[in-house]
Amino acid sequence: MQHWLRLLIVAWLAIGSTLCTAREDRAVNWVFVADLPREAQQTLELIKDSGPFPYARDGIVFGNYEKRLPLRQRGYYHEYTVKTPGRRDRGARRIITGQGYEYYYTDDHYHTFRRIRE
């Protein structure tokens, strides 16, 4: 009986780790910096230079409520506005930063993300 229990535990752990890995890989679509819109490239440079940022909400915590990025503790991600030509408001484009120095770009207000490759 203990043998079956051990097998069950091993199988459960294997399935769980596979599911966690799949969840981590959700945002695997990549985009090169050179392929980003010019405004996104400029925002990325501002982020790396620690500002100054043009929008008051730049740098706020991004909650990842839709769980489209890898799951991390609250406060791990921060968001920055990418200017949209012709828009008076903040528009839909953002760069999300992670504490692990990863950067994600969305041009549809958090529906899809591409990880920025430098």
Regions found by a protein language model. Give the residues of each.
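Residue-identity detector for glutamine
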Residues: 2, 41-42, 73, 99
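Functional cores of ribonucleases/endoribonucleases
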Residues: 51-118
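N-terminal secretory signal peptides
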Residues: 21-68
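General helical secondary-structure elements
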Residues: 2, 19-22, 89
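Bacterial N-terminal signal peptides
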Residues: 3-16
